[in-house]
Amino acid sequence: MRHGVSYRKFSRPTAHRMAMMMNLAVSLVTSERIVTTLPKAKDLRSVVEGLITIAKRYSQKDPVCGRRLLLSRTSGNSSVTNKLLGVLAQRYKNRNGGYTRIMKNGFRKGDCAPIAIIELVDREKDLKVIGS
């Protein structure tokens, strides 16, 4: 029975699954929009929202501790940590969760897997379209 299990295994060992999720999270934070399969997007949402919440929490009260925590969570990627603490923490300071949007995008041609676009809400490109 799988009572209380809140993640998918993706037919991968634990270390591979965690590395895959962190690589997807780094890609999403840097480009703010990626295309992946629907189950991966649904699991990625909780990872990215956790990173943004950590950045919001620590950006004002203890930035050094927050930077160290985010560096350990993002495999030492300093550009992603800087973007989380600088840009994204300020962008979402008045939003309590719900930082990502998942849109279904049909099926993959080879194996008919459901494809989704996951993106950060209130992106700069979205704001330019609304403002013009």
Curated annotation (Swiss-Prot):
GO molecular function: structural constituent of ribosome
A GO CC term attached to the entry: cytosolic large ribosomal subunit
Keyword Aminoacyl-tRNA synthetase among record annotations: no
UniProt-listed GO biological process terms: translation
Matches recorded under InterPro entries: Ribosomal_bL17, Ribosomal_bL17_CS, Ribosomal_bL17_sf
Alphabetic keyword roster: Ribonucleoprotein, Ribosomal protein
Pfam families reported in the protein's UniProt record: Ribosomal_L17
Coiled coil location: none
Family as reported in the entry's similarity comment: Belongs to the bacterial ribosomal protein bL17 family.
Subunit record text: Part of the 50S ribosomal subunit. Contacts protein L32.
Name of the featured protein: Large ribosomal subunit protein bL17
Gene name in the database record: rplQ
